[in-house]
């Protein structure tokens, strides 16, 4: 079988290794020379139009970040996610949303581990799913963090689907907001009445997806399911534990915990198990993580916050005065809601990157004036300016509400540079 491995990053390598079997004739295809070194002797097709000229291949395996719209072939377009779903022997809990996927997936994993289950965490937050497929047993559980890119053309849905808060994002890749939401909806599109959909009942797009689902539907947070009352988690009227057991900042993370509790409730209703699982997870890198305290000012790395809503969640996580670093490259976001939120806080904003002037325009419209634009910044100059402004007892947040490209390689590089700059103060 002639197979094209379309895209050769981390996932592309996993795809190559999985399909590198006797009888398969593999070719690696990418727009630029791959960052991962291809195996010797394997044919390469490199070029801007490489994905548009794949006729003659029986199978084209696209990496998640490659839009199926960019592939032209008379063969079948497939993905590692599709392959995993078609062959995984264990029940899959799939998690999607604009933000919180990795955190919620990790919380579900920790609760199931506390219940004594063997759990495999895969997707962006874990390892490439195909790398683990041979190890998974029918009695295990798989928790799969699923982006819109992975869900784009999926042909099966997980047994338990979790849809978190959805907002405008990735419009630099998706053709429209409708296309983005439609891709997310694949997580439940193939579910049946004996499957389960856990969804954010306070978000219009999550509810829109639920309206189309045939699965049993569980909204969160509600008085009948997982919710928070007076600093404690409840399921219905049953007390689970104090919210202090959750080692994560912000009410948005309490919502993520509620989604995780709902997702595992049919597997375990042991409140001590759930408490243990919630407490075990200390957070993922670059997700509102404490870095250091300098001169009575606390610094937090929230570089993963690439949308306005995630920056709003970071602002609401602290009552103290704040300095927030905002901006980066464009994802087509609307900053008007963030601009209105800024007026509710004692906060000074440092604006950087391509989106700095768009943010400033939104702030001007809302009447928020406590901001400055830093031209041609480095992370050291950004952090140094924050250090100069921040008063004792305040908080400095890197919560950019925009992508990182242009100034940094990716959100992780941005966060790592922030941590390094803070540690140099």
Model regions and ranges:
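Active-site beta-alpha connecting loops in nucleotide-dependent enzymes
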Residues: 3-15, 27-34, 284, 303-375, ...
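Residue-level signal for inorganic ion chemistry
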Residues: 19, 60, 95, 124, ...
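Short active-site oxyanion
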Residues: 25-26, 56-59, 118-119, 139, ...
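Short, basic phosphate-binding NTP loop
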Residues: 1-94, 108, 115, 279, ...
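Phosphate-binding loop of NTP-binding sites
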Residues: 51-59, 64, 68-201, 205-215, ...
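Active-site regions of enzymes building and remodeling cell-envelope glycoconjugates
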Residues: 39-48, 57, 74-79, 90-93, ...
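Short beta-strand "acidic-cap" motif of Rossmann-like dinucleotide-binding folds
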Residues: 26-30, 120-121, 143, 219, ...
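Nucleotide phosphate-binding/pyrophosphate-handling subdomain across enzymes
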Residues: 18, 118, 246-347
């Amino acid at each position: 079988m002639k197979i094209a491995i379309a895209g050769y990053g981390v996932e592309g390598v996993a795809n190559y290794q999985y399909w590198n079997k006797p009888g398969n004739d593999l070719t690696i295809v990418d727009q630029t020379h791959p960052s991962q070194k291809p195996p010797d002797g394997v044919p390469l097709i490199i070029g801007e139009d490489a994905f548009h000229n794949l006729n003659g291949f029986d199978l084209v395996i696209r990496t998640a970040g490659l839009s199926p719209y960019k592939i032209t072939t008379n063969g079948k377009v497939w993905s590692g996610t599709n392959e995993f779903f078609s062959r995984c022997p264990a029940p899959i809990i799939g998690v999607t949303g604009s933000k919180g996927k990795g955190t919620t997936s990790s919380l579900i994993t920790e609760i199931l581990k506390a219940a004594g289950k063997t759990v495999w965490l895969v997707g962006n937050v874990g390892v490439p799913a195909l790398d683990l497929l041979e190890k998974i047993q029918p009695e295990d559980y798989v928790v799969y963090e699923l982006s819109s890119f992975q869900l784009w053309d999926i042909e099966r849905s997980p047994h338990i689907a979790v849809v978190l808060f959805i907002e405008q994002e990735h419009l630099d890749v998706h053709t429209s907001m409708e296309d983005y939401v439609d891709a997310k909806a694949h997580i439940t599109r193939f579910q049946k009445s004996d499957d389960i959909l856990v969804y954010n009942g306070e978000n219009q797009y999550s509810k829109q997806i639920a309206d189309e689902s045939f699965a049993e539907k569980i909204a969160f947070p509600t008085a009948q399911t997982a919710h928070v009352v007076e600093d404690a988690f409840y399921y219905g009227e049953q007390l689970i534990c104090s919210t202090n057991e959750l080692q994560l900042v912000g009410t948005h993370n309490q919502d993520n915990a509620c989604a995780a509790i709902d997702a595992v409730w049919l597997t375990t209703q042991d409140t001590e198990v759930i408490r243990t699982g919630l407490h075990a997870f200390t957070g993922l890198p670059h997700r509102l993580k404490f870095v250091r305290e300098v001169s009575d000012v606390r610094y937090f790395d929230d570089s993963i916050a690439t949308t306005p809503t995630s920056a709003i969640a970071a602002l609401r996580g602290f009552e103290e005065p704040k300095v927030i670093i905002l901006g980066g490259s464009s994802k087509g976001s609307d900053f008007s809601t963030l601009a209105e939120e800024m007026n509710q806080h004692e906060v000074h904003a440092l604006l950087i990157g391509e989106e700095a002037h768009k943010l400033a325009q939104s702030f001007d419209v809302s009447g928020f004036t406590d901001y400055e634009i830093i031209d041609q910044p480095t992370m050291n100059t950004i952090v140094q300016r924050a250090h100069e402004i921040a008063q004792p007892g305040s908080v400095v947040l890197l919560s950019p509400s925009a992508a990182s490209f242009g100034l940094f390689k990716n959100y992780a590089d941005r966060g790592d540079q922030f941590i390094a700059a803070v540690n140099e103060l």
